[in-house]
């Protein structure tokens, strides 16, 4: 599975759509399979994010005795991952994200980095290379 360019906890800017220009923290990242082949394998997958305070939708919920009251609740709706841009924690600008692999001795580390300021954002993975 490929590493995600946007993760839970990142601050993002909405760059397209009705909510354009709004910022928020990513609460959840998930994928939705849109189409499968004859064997049942996913062919077309879209990735979505839930951003705090952005794309608020109203849901009508039934009451559940002892759990919740019924009525209309307001919750965040999904936004396609292509419509948001990460805000770099170093330079505080919306940026594209790249991946950088750094080898130090027998350890290979993969970092997400900001393409504007060229600084590492965080560590994605770390592997120990077997000596040869």
UniProtKB/Swiss-Prot annotation:
Name assigned to this protein: Large ribosomal subunit protein uL24
NCBIfam families tied to this protein: rplX_bact
GO CC annotations, alphabetized: cytosolic large ribosomal subunit
The entry's keywords: Ribonucleoprotein, Ribosomal protein, RNA-binding, rRNA-binding
Family: Belongs to the universal ribosomal protein uL24 family.
Annotated Pfam families: KOW, ribosomal_L24
Source domain of life: Bacteria
GO molecular function, one term: rRNA binding
Functional description taken from the UniProt entry: One of two assembly initiator proteins, it binds directly to the 5'-end of the 23S rRNA, where it nucleates assembly of the 50S subunit.
Gene Ontology biological-process annotations: translation
SMART domains from the UniProt entry: KOW (SM00739)
Gene that specifies this protein: rplX
UniProt entry tagged with the keyword Ribosomal protein: yes
């Amino acid at each position: 599975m490929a590493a995600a360019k946007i993760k839970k906890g990142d601050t993002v800017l909405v760059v397209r759509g009705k909510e354009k220009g709004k910022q928020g923290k990513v609460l959840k990242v998930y994928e939705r399979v849109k189409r499968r082949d004859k064997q049942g394998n996913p062919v077309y997958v879209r990735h979505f994010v839930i951003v705090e305070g952005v794309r608020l939708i109203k849901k009508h919920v039934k009451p559940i005795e002892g759990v919740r009251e019924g009525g209309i609740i307001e919750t965040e709706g999904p936004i396609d991952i292509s419509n948001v841009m990460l805000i770099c924690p170093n330079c505080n600008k919306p940026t594209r994200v790249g991946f950088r692999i750094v080898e130090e001795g027998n350890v290979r580390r993969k970092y997400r980095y900001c393409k504007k300021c060229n600084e590492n954002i965080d560590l994605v993975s770390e592997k120990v290379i077997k000596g040869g």
